[in-house]
Regions:
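SAM-dependent transferase fold signal centered on methyltransferase-like domains
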Residues: 1, 11-13, 61, 84, ...
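Short glycine-enriched, charge-decorated loop/helix-capping segments at active-site entrances
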Residues: 28, 70-72, 191-197
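Short beta-strand motif preference
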Residues: 12, 53, 177-179
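Flexible, acidic/Gly-rich N-terminal and inter-domain linker regions that tether
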Residues: 1-49
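A short, flexible beta-alpha/helix-coil linker loop
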Residues: 19, 69-73, 184-187
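Canonical Radical SAM [4Fe-4S] cluster-binding loop centered on the CxxxCxxC motif
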Residues: 35-36, 43-88
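Conserved AdoMet/S-adenosylmethionine-binding subsite of the radical SAM
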Residues: 90-199
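Non-catalytic surface loops within mature trypsin-like serine protease
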Residues: 5, 16, 57, 147, ...
Length: 199
């Protein structure tokens, strides 16, 4: 289910699984060929719940494959916004127990532009916010970045290193890092990201 908080310019969702048939980005890129031999099975929320939240109110990256440019950019989500998105998604799901709770920092916004708030949220609030409303055997945050050129490689390296420390020490290895590449062709990648991502 997708939720829009128009007052705070935020959007978030929860799903059990979001298979290829719902992959808008793959369709945009023309990746419509069905993969035979891979059986898609719907995942029950009690087995795996995926909550995807906005880390910014809109996004300054303006990628060609995304609808965020239509929203505009209205700043970073603050810690109370991050908390409200997660707790609201859990409550609205009605799920009280899950074996695996994945939090994807990937709905609207580029998380590296809001790293300070995200780091505080992951270190100080996420586990408590989940445990108030559900019993989760594993809590697994996922940091997805487009590697924005404006931050520079030194700052991006620091942010990724700090996230890996949060992963290793706060979540005992239970966290993921995703690099949003979208194409291995450098020209196509630069076009899709409008030259705003490191190659």
């Amino acid at each position: 289910a997708i939720f829009s908080d128009t007052k705070n310019c935020l959007e978030y969702l929860y799903v059990g699984d979001y298979g290829k048939e719902a992959n808008i980005k793959a369709d945009f890129l023309g990746l419509t060929k069905e993969i035979n031999g891979v059986i898609h099975k719907k995942v029950d929320l009690e087995d795996k719940m995926v909550v995807t939240i906005s880390t910014q109110k809109g996004c300054p990256m303006k990628c060609k494959f995304c609808d965020c440019p239509k929203v505009g950019f209205h700043g970073n989500a603050d810690i109370s916004d991050l908390r409200a998105e997660v707790m609201s998604a859990i409550v609205r799901s009605g799920c009280q127990h899950t074996k695996r709770f994945n939090l994807h920092l990937a709905r609207m916004g580029e998380p590296s532009f809001n790293w300070n708030n995200i780091k505080i949220y992951l270190l100080c609030y996420l586990k408590d916010d989940v445990s108030v409303f559900m019993d989760a055997d594993v809590i697994h945050p996922v940091f997805t970045t487009m590697l924005p050129r404006t931050l520079g490689s030194k700052t991006l390296k620091r942010i990724i290193t700090e996230f890996c420390q949060v992963k290793n020490y706060e979540f005992r290895g239970e966290a993921g890092l995703q690099l949003s590449i979208n194409s291995t062709d450098e020209y196509q990648r630069n076009d899709l990201f409008r030259g705003r991502s490191l190659s």
